[in-house]
Amino acid sequence: MIDLEALPHLPGCYLFKDEEGVVLYVGKAKDLKKRVSSYFQKRDHDPKTTSLVQAARGLDFIVTNTEVEALLLENTLIKKHWPRYNILLKDSKRYACIHLTGEKFPRIRIARKNTGDGEFFGPFVSAKERDYIFEVVRKTFQLRTCKKMPSRACLRYHIGACSGPCIGSISEEEYGEKVKRATSVLKGNIGELIESMEKEMKKMAAKQMFEQAMALRDEISALEYLQEKQNMERQKKHDEDILNYIVRDNTVYLMLFKVYKGTLEDKQDYVFAFGEDFLQEFLVQYYSENDPPEELIVPQVLEESLVEFLAHVKGKKVKVTVPKQGEKKELLDLALKNVEIGFFGDRKKLESLQSKLSLPKLPNVIECFDISHLSGTSTVGSMVQFRGGRPDKHNYRRFKIESVEGIDDFASIAEVVRRRYSRLLEDKHEMPDLIIIDGGKGQLSSAFQELRKLKIRVPIISIAKREEELYVPGLKSPLPIKRNEKASLFVQEIRDEAHRFAITYNRLLRQKSLIK
C-alpha cells in the first residue's frame, strides 16, 4: 500500500514498486510529499503516467540533504534498477552520454548512442547535470569539440577554451595528459586527480614555472567545486557500508546504506527485537551472507572479536570507522535521518490502528494469516509478521495443511493458528500484539476458538476481501474500511503481503508436483 502521510516535506528520491516489489519508476523531488501526492491528486495524467499509477502497489523513498544529491542519486538508482516506466516516461534524449573519441587528439561531445570508438560515460538521467559536468571537463582541460580538425585556430582557442591541437600549440603527449585527467574525472576519481595535480603544481612552482602552476591551480579549483556538488557520489578507492539505528519500544530500527566506489546505490532497512548484543548479532548474520565492504562506518566502536570476524570473512582487514565530523559523519547522520523519517512515519500507522480497534497497547508486533489453494489441491497457509510497522521477513512462516482434505478454509485457518501458537507457547516466545485473519466472520470464529482453547488472550480481527470490512469478536457489525484512512490502509497492506506470500508458496508446491 502507498501511505502518502509517511512522506516528508524534504528532498529525496522515490521508488514506485509493483505487488512483487519490483521497481517500476524512480523519481527525484525537491519535496517528496508534494511530488508523490501529485500522482494521486491530478486526474489529467498522460496515458503512460496513468498506467504507472494503476500499476503501483508500493512506495519506498530515500531522503537526501539537497535536491542536487537527489538528482545524482536518481541517476544511480535508475541505472541500477532500469525501471520500465522511466524508459517510457522520460525523454530518451536525457539518457545521453559524454563521449571522448578515439582520435589522435580526442574530442569531447554529447552522444545519444554508445557507438563508435573511444570511451563513453553515463548515461546521465539529468540533462542539466550532464551538461554541467560536460562544461566543467571541457573548459578545465581545454579539449577540442570540433568535428574535423580545422586548418587554423577557431574562436574557442582565442578565448582560452581550447588548447589548439589543430595549429600545433600543444603536443600529442601534453594533450594526451589532459585527456587522461578528463577521463579520471568522468570516471569519478576526482579526489585522486586533485591530489596528483596539487603535487604537480608544487613541483612546477618550485621550478619557477609559474604560468603552468597557475593553470593547474585553476583546473584544481574547478574540480574541487565539481566535487562539492557530488556529496552523494563520493568517488573513493573502496566500497563502504554506512549503518545507523534507533532503539525504541524494545525494537531496533536499522538502516544500511551501500556505497559502491563512492556512489550510494542501495538502502536496506531492518526491524527486529532488541537484545543486549543486537548489533553484533546483526553484523555477524548479515556479513555471513554478504561480502563485507572495505570500510564499515558505524555510530559506535565495535568489539575487537567482531572486527576480526569481518576480516576473516573478507579475507583482509576491514576498516571500521566511527566518524565524529566531516563527510562520513554527514552520511552517518543521513542514514539516521532516514531511520527517523522512514520508520517513525510508520509509528503513526500503529497509533491509528490502536485507536481504531481500541487496543490496550501499541500493536508493535502484528501477525497475519492467509490460506491459498488451487481447486482443493496444494492448500497452504502463510503467516507474515510486521514489527514496528514494517515486514519482518525473518519471522515469516509457511504451513502445508496436514489435517484438512478438500476445500475448508475454516478448518485450515484453525490448523495454522493452532500450530503457530502452540509452538510459541512451547518455546516460551513472545506473543504478537495483534492477530489478523484474511477472511470473514467464519475464518475469524475458527481462529478465535483455537486461541481460547490455548488460553491465549491476544486481540484478533479479520478483514473480508470483497466487502473490505474489519470483523472484531464481540461486535455485531463490522468496522468499515475508510478510503485513505491510515489504519485501514495499514491493515490492507498487511493482508496483501500475507496473500502474496501464500500465493508464492502455493506456486512453489504446484511446480514441485508437476516435476514429480
Swiss-Prot record:
Domain GIY-YIG residue range list: 9-87
Subcellular location: Cytoplasm
Classification via InterPro entries: GIY-YIG_endonuc, GIY-YIG_endonuc_sf, GIY-YIG_UvrC_Cho, UVR_dom, UVR_dom_sf, UvrABC_protein_C, UvrC, UvrC_RNase_H_dom
The UniProt record lists the keyword DNA repair: yes
Highest taxon of the lineage: Archaea
Molecular-function annotations in GO: DNA binding; excinuclease ABC activity
Principal cellular location given in the protein's record: cytoplasm
Domain UVR residues, every copy: 191-226
SUPFAM superfamilies assigned: C-terminal UvrC-binding domain of UvrB (SSF46600), GIY-YIG endonuclease (SSF82771)
GO biological process, one term: nucleotide-excision repair
GO cellular component: cytoplasm; excinuclease repair complex
Record keywords: Cytoplasm, DNA damage, DNA excision, DNA repair, Excision nuclease, SOS response
Pfam families registered for this protein in UniProt: GIY-YIG, UVR, UvrC_RNaseH, UvrC_RNaseH_dom
Oligomer and partners: Interacts with UvrB in an incision complex.
NCBIfam families, A to Z: uvrC
Function: The UvrABC repair system catalyzes the recognition and processing of DNA lesions. UvrC both incises the 5' and 3' sides of the lesion. The N-terminal half is responsible for the 3' incision and the C-terminal half is responsible for the 5' incision.
Family in the record: Belongs to the UvrC family.
PANTHER family: UVRABC SYSTEM PROTEIN C, UVRC/OXIDOREDUCTASE
Protein name: UvrABC system protein C
Species of provenance: Methanosarcina acetivorans (strain ATCC 35395 / DSM 2834 / JCM 12185 / C2A)
Gene assigned in the entry: uvrC
